[in-house]
Curated annotation (Swiss-Prot):
Regions of compositional bias (Basic and acidic residues) in chain numbering: 919-938
Protein name, as recorded: Rho guanine nucleotide exchange factor 2
PROSITE patterns: DH_2 (PS50010), PH_DOMAIN (PS50003), ZF_DAG_PE_1 (PS00479), ZF_DAG_PE_2 (PS50081)
InterPro entries: ARHGEF2_PH, C1-like_sf, DBL_dom_sf, DH_dom, PE/DAG-bd, PH-like_dom_sf, PH_16, PH_domain
Notes on the domains: The DH (DBL-homology) domain promotes tyrosine phosphorylation of RIPK2. The DH (DBL-homology) domain interacts with and promotes loading of GTP on RhoA.
Length: 985
């Protein structure tokens, strides 16, 4: 039993091992089958981020990708099912399939003679005629697919499940080879046979005309006998006209090649994204429509100029009217927009084409096979883009040559001259638009490269961020060298914009504002540009706010000259800060956008009203023609009513007066000059209803007419009433009433436009509400005509400017008022102090006057008792107010000055004759002497002093010995004023 169990256990283990090996083999086979797709044997590799996928043309960002070592194709893992068959394996499969098909078909034909009927080989491979029909009738390349040509069930025929297995395999292999052949035929069929077919189809409309313009010139295209009938000037003119039509035909062919061959092939065959194809061929549909229409007009003019019985001989005498219609009006505007867009994106389109050609192998193969054809040998993508860009520059040259040979017909010469002016204006506008679009693209590129957090402070204005750049237009830019205060040169990018100069630096492949010793944003207001005398490339930029001087250096002398010229032009055109603030807040930006939209809506409303007037005039003219007035010219439309740029267009009172004048003239025509309108008829708010009966009126010849709600335009009965004395035909009153009616309608519509604009204006000027507007309306009604005209003459642009000016004046007045208040307070304080000082000085003056009067009386009384000798030696010297130390000897005796006596409470002074010899006291000495009251108080009881004491005080000492005794007097006994008291004497 143990042996049997061991054998059983061994058998079970072997079965488990076999099952495990089988599962592993199946897994390996599944993994191999997963890698083997469409003949590709994919292996997993690691790639970098710059590797492009062959299937979707996108970068492979994953760490692992699939590569086929047979054909060296690297793709995403998700793109392996969309990849075409392997090129090297496909060739082997085709050869093997052909061999198998030949042997299989022979065996099938031998076996199926008795069982089934033989099927033709066209069921497997389409015949040449069928293939040509497919190529000739196709509009896309999807018609060659297997599903639309031959089906698998049709190939299998009536085979059932009992059919031999080998036959089914042969048929399936032949079907696969057919499917493979159809897939490879997609691009190759277009290149080998489809290009010429496509070209013939797209030029089928101009096939006959293209053959007529195969010759190089008109002289070679017409018959020689017909050529000899014309002068040399006519031949030159016709040669240029022939060249114009021929080059226009070639231009249309170029545009159709771009649209129908290249673009269609890229979209349908290469499955490229529409945005990429649009970047390669911008606005080609619009350009094709414009030039196809123009070419049709030129060819129609040629057919009209053909000689009878000939298809080659023609002479075009008039071409100016056709050129004027092409290069003016809506056609010119459409050409301007399309050519501006195309030419501005010309550089980007060429750059994109070169990038695609360098990195995309399928695109490169497509372009090579397309240009292999004889039709497209000289019409590659780059050549087509360049030809379209240069086409608009050829028109002025051709028209100028036609003009030089058109001196015979004056009207034609004037039309050609006008057309030449229009073409030059169009070319100038396109050039300007291209320049602006290029600058906008350049500004957007700089904006995208700037650091989002980059800001620079502007003195007194706040931070200047990168969003402020988009508010402005880029005028000029370039790299310069900025010389700093330390003498070093820094590379900067200088942007000349609408109102500022901006200095930028590049850091970590991003632009930031310069962080040097001076502001990086310079206002163009009062900016001075000067070149450096001793340097060929340097220039100074001197700004006034804040006062700074920048020294920059250009790359060359011509570059510096260009910078100086464009900066000076921009300084002259720089807007004011009231119209264009340096830094705009979000609220101001939103308000500006709203005002712009409001102006656009007003403009659209005015255009609609103008269109309304035109339609009304057309309707009235049509009714007049229906009424029997054949040959009546259409009424002229009133001009100048809908021009927003003129102040006169907004004077509603003038329009109303003109409307009333038209009503009076219309009344005179319909009712007669002697009939007055009733008061209700003058009011515009009372229209005549259709069912209100008839309104009697009197015509010019006295016949009664009835006007049922509208004016009937009818012809007069007799022709004699419509002729004057000279027999000239006169216009009937109804005909004369037509023009005033149109004028009246236009004036009323213009008045409506004025009312709407003024309402918008008042709403913008007075946001407080309707009460303010009612008050203003009442005030204006009292002011009279001058006030109404002033309010009506305000345009939205003018009111915005005046509002900004008023706000600026209000802020300035507020600042001036505050400054005046502070100055008034300072002046009031100063005036109070001056008044206090004035009162003190008045009191001191009155006191001094009283003292002087008292001293005069005392001197007069003293002079009567003992006059002072004027020749006294001590009277010749000035009075010393105080002595701290006394000299000894004769010098002290000779320099003695007696003290001034005092009597009572009054001070005794010297006589006027003696005092006039003394020098006046200065301020310090007067301070030391003190006031008269102080000096009088220092004396001890002046009433007890006798006259002898007074005389002794005034007499000099008798000898120098007395001076010796006087030296012993201590200084403490002297008075502060330098005068001895009565006790000391």
């Amino acid at each position: 039993m143990s042996r049997i169990e061991s054998l059983t256990r061994a058998r079970i283990d072997r079965s488990k091992e076999q099952a495990t090996k089988t599962r592993e083999k199946e897994k390996m086979k599944e993994a191999k089958d997963a890698r083997y797709t469409n003949g590709h044997l994919f292996t997993t590799i690691s790639v970098s981020g710059m590797t492009m996928c062959y299937a979707c043309n996108k970068s492979i960002t994953a760490k692992e990708a699939l590569i086929c070592p047979t054909c060296n194709v690297t793709i995403h893992n998700r793109c392996k099912d969309t990849l075409a068959n392997c090129t090297k394996v496909k060739q082997k499969q085709q050869k093997a399939a052909l061999l198998r098909n030949n042997t299989a078909l022979q065996s099938v034909s031998l076996r199926s003679k008795t069982t089934t009927r033989e099927r033709p080989t066209s069921a497997i491979y389409p015949s040449d005629s069928f293939r040509q029909s497919l190529l000739g009738s196709r509009r896309g390349l999807s018609s060659l697919s297997l599903a639309k040509s031959v089906s698998t069930t049709n190939i299998a025929g009536h085979f059932n499940d009992e059919s031999p297995l080998g036959l089914r395999q042969i048929l399936s292999q032949s079907t696969d080879s057919l499917n493979m052949r159809n897939r490879t035929l997609s691009v190759e069929s277009l290149i080998d046979e489809g290009v010429e077919v496509f070209y013939n189809e797209l030029m089928s409309d101009f096939e006959m005309d293209e053959k007529d313009f195969e010759a190089d010139s008109w002289s070679l295209a017409v018959d020689s006998s017909f050529l000899q009938q014309h002068k040399k000037e006519v031949m030159k003119k016709q040669d240029v006209i022939y060249e114009l039509i021929q080059t226009e035909l070639h231009h249309v062919r170029t545009l159709k090649i771009m649209t129908r061959l290249f673009r269609t092939g890229m979209l349908e065959e290469l499955q490229m994204e529409p945005e990429v194809v649009q970047g390669l061929f911008p606005c080609v549909d619009e350009l094709s429509d414009i030039h196809t229409r123009f070419l049709s007009q030129l060819l129609e003019r040629r057919r009209q100029a053909l000689c009878p019985g000939s298809t080659r001989n023609f002479v075009i005498h008039r071409l100016g009217d056709l050129l004027i219609s092409q290069f003016s009006g809506s056609n010119a505007e459409q050409m301007r927009k399309t050519y501006s867009e195309f030419c501005s994106r010309h550089t980007k389109a060429l750059k994109l084409y070169k990038e695609l050609y360098a990195r995309d192998k399928r695109f490169q193969q497509f372009i090579r096979k397309m240009t292999r054809s004889a039709v497209l040998k000289r019409h590659g993508v780059q050549e087509c883009i360049l030809l379209v860009t240069q086409r608009i520059t050829k028109y002025p040259v051709l028209i100028n040559r036609i003009l030089q040979n058109s001196h015979g017909i004056e009207e034609e010469y004037q039309d050609l001259a006008a057309a030449l002016g229009l073409v030059k204006e169009l070319l100038s506008n396109v050039d300007q638009d291209v320049h602006e679009l290029e600058k906008e693209a350049r500004l957007q590129e700089i904006y995208n490269r700037m650091d989002p957090r980059a800001q620079t402070p502007v003195p007194g204005k706040g931070p200047f961020g990168r969003d402020e750049l988009l508010r402005r237009k880029l005028i000029h830019d370039g790299c310069l060298l900025w010389k700093t205060a330390t003498g070093r040169f820094k590379d900067v990018l200088l942007l000349l914009m609408t109102d500022v100069l901006v200095f930028l630096q590049e850091k970590d492949q991003k632009y930031i504002f310069t962080s040097l010793d001076k502001p990086s944003v310079v206002s163009l207001q009062n900016l001075i540009v000067r070149d450096i005398a001793n340097q060929a490339k340097g220039m100074f930029l001197i700004s006034s706010g804040p006062p700074e001087m920048y020294e920059v250096h250009a790359a060359s002398r011509d570059d510096r000259t260009t910078w100086i010229r464009v900066i000076q032009q921009s300084v002259r055109l720089c807007p004011s800060r009231e119209d264009f603030p340096l830094i705009e807040t979000e609220d101001k930006a939103y308000l500006r956008r709203i005002k712009t939209k409001l102006q656009q809506k007003n403009q659209a409303l005015v255009e609609l009203l103008q269109m309304n007037v035109e339609l009304f005039a057309e309707m009235v003219h049509f009714q007049a023609l229906k009424a029997g007035f054949i040959g009546m010219p259409p009424p002229t439309l009133p001009r100048g009513l809908f021009r927003l740029e003129s102040f006169e267009s907004l004077r509603g009172e003038r329009l109303l007066k003109d409307a009333l004048r038209e009503v009076e003239g219309l009344k005179d025509l319909l009712l007669g000059p002697c009939v007055d309108l009733p008061l209700t008829a003058r009011e515009p708010a009372l229209p005549v209803e259709a069912d209100s009966g008839s309104c009697p009126g009197v015509t010019a010849n006295g016949e009664a007419r009835t006007f049922n709600g509208s004016i009937e335009l009818c012809r007069a009965d007799s022709d004699s009433s419509q002729k004057d004395r000279n027999g000239n035909q006169l216009r009937s009153p109804q005909e004369e009433a037509l023009q005033p009616l149109v004028n009246l309608y236009g004036l009323l519509q213009g008045l409506q436009a004025v009312v709407v604009q003024q309402e918008r204006l008042m709403e913008a000027l007075f946001p407080e509400g309707p009460e303010r507007w009612e008050k203003l309306s009442r005030a204006n009604s009292r002011d009279g005509e001058a006030g109404r005209a002033a309010v009506a003459s305000v345009t939205p642009e003018k009111q915005a400017t005046e509002l900004a000016l008023l706000q600026r004046q209000h802020s300035l007045l507020q600042e001036e008022l505050r400054r005046c208040q502070r100055l008034g307070e300072e002046r009031a304080t100063e005036a109070g102090s001056l008044e206090a000082r004035l009162r003190e000085s008045e009191q001191a003056r009155a006191l001094l006057e009283r003292e002087a009067e008292e001293i005069r009386r005392q001197l007069a009384a003293l002079g009567q008792n003992e006059p002072l000798p004027a020749e006294a030696p001590w009277a010749r010297r000035p009075l010393d107010p105080r002595r701290r130390s006394l000299p000894a000897g004769d010098a002290l005796y000779l320099s003695f000055n007696p003290p001034q006596p005092s009597r009572g409470h009054d001070r005794l002074d010297l006589p006027v004759t003696v005092r006039s010899l003394h020098r006046p006291f200065d301020d310090r000495e007067a301070q030391e002497l003190g006031s008269p009251e102080d000096r009088l108080q220092d004396s001890s009881d002046p009433d007890t002093c006798s006259e002898e004491e007074v005389s002794s005080r005034l007499s000099p000492p008798h000898s120098p010995r007395d001076f010796t005794r006087m030296q012993d007097i201590p200084e403490e006994t002297e008075s502060r004023d330098g005068e001895p008291t009565a006790s000391e004497s």
